Design a protein with these regions (language model features):
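Extended terminal accessory/targeting regions
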Residues: 27-197
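N-terminal secretory signal peptides that target proteins for export/translocation
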Residues: 1-8
């Protein structure tokens, strides 16, 4: 269901969001000409918005892992002591998400759209690698905690890292109106409103 908040921003926001979500999987590669063609206008719009004299970067805030993952994890851990004791009170990879949010906050202040595109791709790949590496470095410890083999821990964390990568590639582009978008520290922008000109 589309929230009233999104609907209240006008039809161009909804269209932009839909186009961005449909195009998400296409721009997974840094050499993907079609993906860049779809996403670069939004990066240009973000940079144009950022360069306006009245645009201010908001203070950095993080929700941990977006999409409600950290919030739900904490809720479950608060309600079920055994869950927190076994699986920790925050997602074990939350530090990876916070680092990712720091890059997304200001879009690394990229000077142009291609640099912004590449920086976002790097941030997303770094998130995936961070989660995957955590499964490798903590494999023996977590295998004992979870009651599975170390190889299963590595596979699980690689799967989680991959899913997180695709989620942020799919829904994290600039100018989507989403709170976890690339450049979320700046006011939202819109390709359809001419911010990319």
């Amino acid at each position: 269901m589309i929230s009233r908040r999104v609907l209240g921003r006008g039809p161009e926001r909804i269209l932009g969001l839909c186009l961005g979500l449909m195009a998400g999987p296409v721009w997974a590669g840094d050499n993907d000409v079609i993906g860049q063609a779809l996403e670069l206008p939004a990066h240009r719009a973000l940079i144009a918005k950022r360069q306006r004299p009245d645009t201010e970067l908001r203070r950095f805030e993080t929700d941990g892992c977006s999409g409600g993952l950290s919030e739900v994890w904490r809720l479950v851990a608060d309600q079920f002591e055994g869950f927190a004791r076994t699986y920790e009170s925050i997602p074990p990879w939350e530090s990876c998400c916070v680092t990712h949010d720091q890059a997304y906050h200001n879009g690394v202040n990229a000077p142009d759209a291609r640099v912004s595109f590449a920086a976002r791709l790097l941030a997303d790949r770094t998130l995936e690698a961070c989660v995957t590496d955590m499964g490798i470095t903590r494999r023996d410890e977590l295998a004992e905690v979870y009651g599975i083999t170390p190889d299963q821990v590595e596979t699980a964390y690689a799967t989680i890292g991959g899913a997180m990568y695709w989620a942020v590639r799919f829904g994290g582009g600039p100018c989507t109106g989403l709170p976890w978008r690339w450049g979320f520290g700046y006011p939202d922008c819109s390709v359809l409103a001419g911010d990319d000109k």
